[in-house]
Swiss-Prot record:
Keywords: Cytoplasm, Hydrolase, Protease, Serine protease
UniProt organism field: Fusobacterium nucleatum subsp. nucleatum (strain ATCC 25586 / DSM 15643 / BCRC 10681 / CIP 101130 / JCM 8532 / KCTC 2640 / LMG 13131 / VPI 4355)
GO cellular component: cytoplasm; endopeptidase Clp complex
Organism lineage string: Bacteria, Fusobacteriati, Fusobacteriota, Fusobacteriia, Fusobacteriales
Protein name per its UniProtKB record: ATP-dependent Clp protease proteolytic subunit
Keyword Protease on entry: yes
């Protein structure tokens, strides 16, 4: 992946930053890939760093993600709710699956999407081809059902929908436009020029 470098010139000196470090300087975190352990650890570290820098100033998280690992996404979610600064969320492009979950987890009144963004919610998936004894598969299935239930509870809390409606609406992939995401309660408004 190409990682651009930007030059910051304050009139007295110049400093080169990779683009993500430059964004971080302005309290911006960019989630631009699928969420896995490495991505989650980086985002969590950035959230904690920005809280330590100024616990009163908002953090802005831009999301363009197809989703990813539930456990890694939940670690980000918990950190967003643990730190003192409000986390504004902005969808650019897509926020699908765990990306949509994190988009909805932003501070109330501070959750946005650009006009042509797409948001997709669905139930959690097992990936990687589950193998093993029937008992082990049953254990994994029960855990997946618990995760599905917990995600529905949290999404209901963040959207104002009932848990039952969330469970119905996430039974299959459910794609929403930015406006539909506002009406659903996933975001608060659409950014337009």
């Amino acid at each position: 992946m190409y990682n651009p470098t930007v030059i910051d010139n304050n009139g007295k000196s110049e400093r080169a930053y990779d683009i993500y470090s430059r964004l971080l300087k302005d309290r911006i975190i960019f989630v631009g890939t699928a969420i896995d352990e490495t991505v989650a650890n980086s985002i969590i570290a950035q959230l904690l760093y920005l809280e330590a820098e100024d616990p009163e100033k908002d953090i802005i998280m831009y999301i363009n993600s197809p989703g990813g690992s539930v456990t890694d996404g939940m670690a980000i979610y918990d950190t967003m709710n643990y730190i003192k600064p409000d986390v504004q969320t902005v969808c650019v492009g897509q926020a699908a699956s765990m990306g949509a979950f994190l988009l909805a987890a932003g501070a109330k009144g501070k959750r946005f999407a650009l006009e042509n963004s797409r948001i997709m919610i669905h139930q959690p998936l097992i990936s990687g081809g589950l193998k093993g004894q029937a008992t082990d598969i049953s254990i994994h299935a029960n855990e997946l059902l618990k995760i599905k239930d917990r995600l529905a509870e949290l999404l209901a809390k963040n959207t104002g929908k009932t848990k039952e409606q969330i469970l119905r609406d996430t039974e299959r992939d459910n794609y929403l436009s930015s406006e539909e995401a506002v009406n659903y309660g996933l975001i608060d408004s659409v950014f337009r020029r």
